[in-house]
């Protein structure tokens, strides 16, 4: 009887020790079985596909902004609703939402797009790296500061001659490369090509 009691106590102590060792590290042998897989939101993927389709006709001159503008506003409204409801969970969700937000015209939306890209990258979605740089550049451009990654071009002249928006040239090409952004020299070469094409 005494032997059985000792064995029972040993088993209880081992179980208690397992709990003490496991809990501080947030590990549980049942976690993987209890946690259902998190799926991307199909609606966000569809909204981003529509956003891109509106911007990529065979001839860019065929984009009718009187039609695309209201569509953008509706997509933006829906993305903000999903974000406010804490529906975004996966890297793809954050990336899709950021892509739509960065087509806003408000600095706060560009900043949120950048933050969503950071979240997407942290969840393993490398597609968001370039967009993280571009959304930061859009934010800076919108508040009148030089962009950092040379992703943004503007056309200010009457004949809409594109030029690279002013760039903070202290940012290194290595950092640009880490975010899947072309070098500053490549951005300037693209600017020259766009200007030649416009003549």
Please state what every model-predicted region is.
Residues 1-4:
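Positively charged n-region of N-terminal signal peptides that target proteins for export
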Residues 123-135:
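Boundary/linker segments of alpha-helical solenoid repeat arrays
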Residues 98, 102-106, 140:
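Short coil/turn linking the two alpha-helices of tandem helical-hairpin repeats
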Residues 110-126, 153-157:
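TPR/TPR-like (Sel1-like) alpha-helical repeat modules
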Residues 64-68, 105-111:
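Short coil/turn connectors between adjacent alpha-helices in alpha-solenoid helical repeat scaffolds
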Residues 9-21:
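Hydrophobic membrane-insertion alpha-helices, especially the h-region
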Residues 26-91, 123, 142-155, 161-169, ...:
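N-terminal alpha-helical interaction modules that lie
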